[in-house]
Design a protein with these regions (language model features):
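A conserved regulatory-domain signal marking ACT and ACT-like small-molecule sensing domains
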Residues: 3, 13, 29, 51, ...
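A short, basic/flexible loop-to-alpha-helix module at the beginning of a structural domain
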Residues: 16-20, 24-25, 29-45
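N-terminal Rossmann-fold NAD(P) dinucleotide-binding loop
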Residues: 57
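NAD(P)-binding Rossmann-fold cofactor-contacting core
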Residues: 67-89
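Catalytic, metal-anchored helix/loop core of enzyme active sites in primary metabolism
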Residues: 95, 186-190, 196-201, 205, ...
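Rossmann-fold NAD(P) dinucleotide-binding segment
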Residues: 100-138
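Rossmann-fold NAD(P)-binding glycine/threonine-rich loop
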Residues: 122-127, 140-167, 174-177
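Substrate-binding/catalytic subdomain of NAD(P)-dependent oxidoreductase enzymes
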Residues: 213-311, 316-318
């Protein structure tokens, strides 16, 4: 699989789901009242409990309370400090509580878990499934680490667990992988899965501002946490990639087994050099299944400026899939936010309710999940950016090391106008495996003229 340069992937309009939130903004903010109107068509009268009343939980409750006809009946809302959370628009017969066990002991049929994290979310979800209650969750950490086990537990108890909101927020990529594309044999998935990183990188690209300034702007706009390490260093994206691998490639992957590279070293000058190569820079999460090996990686990459990935701006998400029969598909939209994520949660809720009431199908059986070997040893062209103290013989020394490691130089780029005490220049390499490149990088890191670690980025064509 080649992302994003294949012909089908370039024709992004041919096979694409565009989420509502990715369309041009309207003059007035969309209301949660515009959520799926066919809630009223579900006649299951399912009793639903909501655990977690933060941004997403509140939006979910608002959709259920303002658009429902009682067929999906919210009966419990559970949260810490619950008295401070109460809202006048919630019906008077809804039970507000901070006692999770009382919710699990009640007669609810579906539990919505929106507290996030592993503890106590894992125990809550296992308890609910163990008692035969279906679960809807947006918890990426939980599904990334325990998804296969939870799917098996649900199957053994005759209930369901749905997690469509755990990746890409309001973009229905996970339901599509588990239902709409289940007839295909997918072999590759790649995506822009973290809106924080995409916002920062696209701001550096468009304004040529320092990384630190772009991060501060993202934090001021609410796109990045005060401690954004999980986003910047790839932890968030690799958890999401593990979920996509489970849903689309039927592969059990521990998130920590996926190599994650930080976007922190990316400099504005890298966008200048990337532009000379017809590229820009994005954080790309990619997984490619070949026989019994899953090649997986998360980190900044050079992508063609006119490719689907290169055109994604701000905090949007894009997922591309490649299948043996159906070819390439693209899913684009808002990857975070209360309303888009709530729509995904409610859509999962409706699917479960319809299954309970009408004997509908279940998604995502875990019986065919395999545990492949995980590798980051992709073969690809490479972009190497150095910062050096200028002196004679630098290129010759670097070329000598690369030749010793059987690496072929493709091009050398050097822009004028920089101080000789801190001179950036770029070497691009012909395709080679990661395992050949890194011993050479370790050797070059010890050269006396280097003043920053070499930035090494894959070039995706």
């Amino acid at each position: 699989m080649q992302f994003p340069g294949s012909d089908v992937a370039r024709m992004i309009g041919d096979s694409i789901f565009v989420a509502r939130e990715s369309l041009p903004k309207q003059t007035s903010k969309p209301s949660t009242k515009a959520a799926p109107s066919n809630i009223q068509e579900r006649r299951s009268n399912c009793r639903v409990a909501l655990i977690g009343f933060g941004t997403v939980g509140r939006a979910v409750a608002k959709i259920l309370c303002e658009n429902g006809d009682g067929s999906l009946r919210l009966t419990h809302i559970c949260n810490r400090n619950v008295e401070r959370k109460k809202q006048p628009w919630v019906p008077a017969d809804v039970v507000w509580t901070d006692d999770v066990q009382s919710v699990l002991n009640s007669d609810v049929q579906i539990v919505i878990e929106l507290i996030g994290g592993l503890n106590p979310a894992e125990q809550i979800v296992r308890s609910a499934l163990g008692s035969g209650k279906s679960v809807v969750t947006a918890n990426k950490q939980l599904i990334a680490r325990h998804g296969p086990d939870l799917l098996q537990l649900a199957a053994s108890k005759g209930c369901q667990i749905e997690f469509g909101a755990s990746v890409a927020g309001g973009v229905p990529v996970l339901p599509s992988l588990r239902t709409g594309l289940c007839g295909d044999r997918l072999h590759g998935i790649a995506g822009i899965l973290n809106g924080t990183c995409n916002y920062i990188l696209s701001r550096i690209e468009n304004a040529r501002i320092p990384f630190s300034e772009a991060l501060e702007e993202a934090q001021a706009r609410g796109y990045a946490e005060a401690d954004a390490s999980e986003d910047l260093d790839g932890g968030d994206a690799r958890a999401k990639l593990a979920i996509l691998a489970l849903a689309g490639l039927h592969s059990r992957v521990a998130p920590e087994s996926i190599r994650a590279r930080s976007i922190r070293p990316v400099d504005a000058v890298d966008f200048d050099y990337a532009a000379e190569l017809g590229c820009t820079i994005r954080q790309i999460s990619r997984a490619d299944l070949k026989a019994d090996t899953l090649f997986a990686d998360v980190g900044p990459c050079l992508v063609p400026t006119d490719s689907p990935f290169g055109r994604v701006q701000r905090n949007l998400n894009l997922v591309l899939t490649s299948g043996q029969y159906g070819g390439d598909m693209a899913f684009l939209g808002a990857g975070a936010g209360g309303d888009p994520t709530a729509v995904a949660v409610v859509s999962d809720l409706m699917f479960v309710a319809e299954s309970l009431s009408a004997g509908g199908g279940k998604r995502g059986a875990a019986s065919n999940v395999s545990t492949p070997e995980i590798s980051s040893d992709f073969e690809t062209p490479w972009y190497l950016r150095f910062f050096v103290r200028d002196q004679p013989g630098i290129v010759a020394r670097l070329a000598q090391i690369m030749a010793a490691h059987r690496l072929n130089i493709d091009s050398l780029l050097q822009k004028p106008g920089f101080e000789k005490s801190s001179l950036p220049f770029v070497i691009t390499l012909e395709p080679c495996r990661d395992s050949l490149l890194h011993p050479a990088l370790e050797e070059m890191a010890g050269l006396e003229f280097t003043i920053r670690p070499c930035l090494c980025l894959p070039i995706l064509r």
